[in-house]
């Protein structure tokens, strides 16, 4: 992950969406920024909240778009153009219906798999380019008749939130460790192997 220059946490704007399933990508970015003793600041130029963090002497920009999910690409394009960052140098974090709460995966893909935020990023920045993502599991509604659009905009229950936060903690540890592998090309497989190792040892701290 040595080539990563920007980490993006996809989310919907407006405070009422902060704790919803669709916003778990921003949960990871906020946790990462907090660990760095930094704060995300509103940046109208980038249509989002951004800051710069330093991981093992490597400066990395972080962004949470302040656009609705299906317009995320506009914000990502603004910051990537300003800093001359290419799509393959971006790590995007988002919610994933096909992973249960507590599960998380690194993916190197050029398809959106039905996610509207990723769909827009690809539409704006380039549809045939593979880029790295962290998929944070939110699961699917138990009732098959429950609308997905309503489900992703709802809040996970207490146990689900604990599982999601644990997955986020593990993913952040992989981000740190993979950046530390300066002369090693980290593949999707190697990142997920590292992730599996941490999933067996991550501890949740209750607030």
Swiss-Prot record:
The record's subcellular location field reads:
Cytoplasm
Just give the chief location class: cytoplasm
Q: Kindly list the residues the record flags as site (Discriminates between blocked and unblocked aminoacyl-tRNA).
A: 12
Positions bearing the site annotation: Stabilizes the basic form of H active site to accept a proton: 95
Has the keyword GTP-binding been applied to this entry? no
Give the residues annotated as active site.
22
- Which Gene Ontology molecular-function terms are recorded? peptidyl-tRNA hydrolase activity; tRNA binding
State its role. Hydrolyzes ribosome-free peptidyl-tRNAs (with 1 or more amino acids incorporated), which drop off the ribosome during protein synthesis, or as a result of ribosome stalling. Catalyzes the release of premature peptidyl moieties from peptidyl-tRNA molecules trapped in stalled 50S ribosomal subunits, and thus maintains levels of free tRNAs and 50S ribosomes.
Q: Provide the residue positions that the database annotates as binding tRNA.
A: 17, 68, 70, 116
This protein's GO CC annotations: cytoplasm
Its Enzyme Commission number(s) read 3.1.1.29
The subunit field of the Swiss-Prot or TrEMBL record says: Monomer.
PANTHER family tied to this protein: PEPTIDYL-TRNA HYDROLASE
Pfam families given in the database record: Pept_tRNA_hydro
What superkingdom heads the lineage? Bacteria
Q: Which reaction does it catalyse?
A: an N-acyl-L-alpha-aminoacyl-tRNA + H2O = an N-acyl-L-amino acid + a tRNA + H(+)
Family as reported in the entry's similarity comment: Belongs to the PTH family.
Q: Quote the protein name from its UniProt record.
A: Peptidyl-tRNA hydrolase
Q: Which positions carry the signal peptide feature in this UniProt record?
A: none
Gene from which the chain derives: pth
Q: Name the Gene Ontology biological process terms.
A: protein quality control for misfolded or incompletely synthesized proteins; rescue of stalled ribosome
Keywords (A to Z) from UniProt: Cytoplasm, Hydrolase, RNA-binding, tRNA-binding
